[in-house]
Amino acid sequence: MGKFLQLLSHPTELKAVIQLFGFRQPLHPGKRDVNDKELGRCYELLNLTSRSFAAVIEELHPELRDAVMIFYLVLRALDTIEDDMTIKSSIKIPLLREFDTKLNTKNWTFDGYGPNEKDRTVLVEFDKILNVYHRLKPQYQDIIKSITFKMGNGMADYILDEEFNVYGVATVEDYNLYCHYVAGLVGEGLTNLFVLANFGDKTLTENNFAKADSMGLFLQKTNIIRDYHEDLQDGRSFWPREIWSKYTENLQDFHKVKTPAKEFAGVSCINELVLNALGHVTDCLDYLSLVKDPSSFSFCAIPQVMAVATLAEVYNNPKVLHGVVKIRKGTTCRLILESRTLPGVVKIFKEYIQVINHKSSVRDPNYLKIGIKCGEIEQYCEMIYPNKQALPPSMKSLPENKFTKIVASRESIDLSVQRRIEPGNFNCNVVLFGIGALILSLIYFVLY
């Protein structure tokens, strides 16, 4: 009931919910051969482990849909082993380091997990995942195997790192490296898949996948900031000591010590972490501008717009120190609908960067730095899609920049997606108008 009342208090979000579930047409409906039991079971496992990821993966172009699904399940299996504290290190470390070799087999499974491990099914039925993996194009298999090797060894290194296990993340450099292993490598693998399928520009692989790495780091850092309280309850934290030590001697004190001074220090720390995360935004916008396939674009864009909206929610927000802070479900639906084209994504980023800037407090130690960073990002958004009305009368055309050719080359892609969007918008508006008129008629009939 509370969520329904929340939607009623935000009419645009209520409309977004209705439009998303009633009128949005997916680019590639997830149709599969009903007789392919093992492929079907893999998609069931995907839904069991993450319904949100399943929804976007199932709408991918058929060329990459199965490959991305298997990529996700393989990494989920790896993550399940790493997370399970009941597995002895003598078993876990070699298993993580050699997990990529299991992809050479066709019937490997694992039953040495703990009874409370929620995603253990992916290990019990890993042979079904292997069956579908071996049906993928060899190039796609190689990409999945390569990332599995890198991530498995990264996980093993962190388990053996006593300083990390005792004290957590030390420096910002360590913070970046940890996020790289957890999320940046996923971006690298996906980018290789996009480029190989000709769904993304080859320049996405340049500079050691720097832009793809930023995509992953932006998402992971946002989650780390948001999950402070939850991680604290689990006896861990990923906030880098180099940042939080400026504000407190003990990281737990942000939650435990309930004084105005400590709350201000905690919020100031949150804001510096947000500032750090914002350093990846321009790379993310660069990356998205170079993804050419509409379904792959949505797959990449949705998590990014959720992340920038979440950053705006956690910024300058003391609730992060004492509980879970999330964006509203209605906001999520609106962002999914509005992030289907590059102009839509740029508009969303600009919107939430302005929210962050307006939430800033002059008392914050990083007030000026945040203001400058927000200004830089807004200017970057303007560079991608300049405001023609803001041009001085003497200028007859927009000045060219590095985005001029990129935007021109993808204009037909975004326009074709926009043409698919418009009927859904129109039909939703017609239905809502009809419902509104009916309600008003009933009210008039009852009252008069």
Swiss-Prot record:
Reaction catalysis annotation: 2 (2E,6E)-farnesyl diphosphate + NADPH + H(+) = squalene + 2 diphosphate + NADP(+); 2 (2E,6E)-farnesyl diphosphate + NADH + H(+) = squalene + 2 diphosphate + NAD(+)
Recorded topology in the membrane: Single-pass membrane protein
Enzyme Commission numbers on file: 2.5.1.21
Keywords for this protein: Endoplasmic reticulum, Isoprene biosynthesis, Lipid biosynthesis, Lipid metabolism, Magnesium, Membrane, Microsome, Multifunctional enzyme, NADP, Steroid biosynthesis, Steroid metabolism, Sterol biosynthesis, Sterol metabolism, Transferase, Transmembrane, Transmembrane helix
Cell compartment(s), UniProt: Endoplasmic reticulum membrane; Microsome
Enzyme class: transferase
Entry GO terms, CC: endoplasmic reticulum membrane
GO annotation (BP), single: ergosterol biosynthetic process
Entry cofactors: Mg(2+)
Membrane-spanning intervals of the chain: 420-440
Entry-linked Gene3D superfamilies: Farnesyl Diphosphate Synthase (1.10.600.10)
Coiled coil: none
GO MF entries: squalene synthase [NAD(P)H] activity
Entry's induction text: Expression is induced by lovastatin and fluconazole and is repressed by amphotericin B and caspofungin. Expression is repressed during spider biofilm formation.
Pfam families: SQS_PSY
Record pathway: Terpene metabolism; lanosterol biosynthesis; lanosterol from farnesyl diphosphate: step 1/3
SUPFAM superfamilies in the record: Terpenoid synthases (SSF48576)
Membership in a protein family: Belongs to the phytoene/squalene synthase family.
Function: Squalene synthase; part of the third module of ergosterol biosynthesis pathway that includes the late steps of the pathway. ERG9 produces squalene from 2 farnesyl pyrophosphate moieties. The third module or late pathway involves the ergosterol synthesis itself through consecutive reactions that mainly occur in the endoplasmic reticulum (ER) membrane. Firstly, the squalene synthase ERG9 catalyzes the condensation of 2 farnesyl pyrophosphate moieties to form squalene, which is the precursor of all steroids.
NCBIfam families, A to Z: squal_synth (TIGR01559)
Protein name: Squalene synthase ERG9
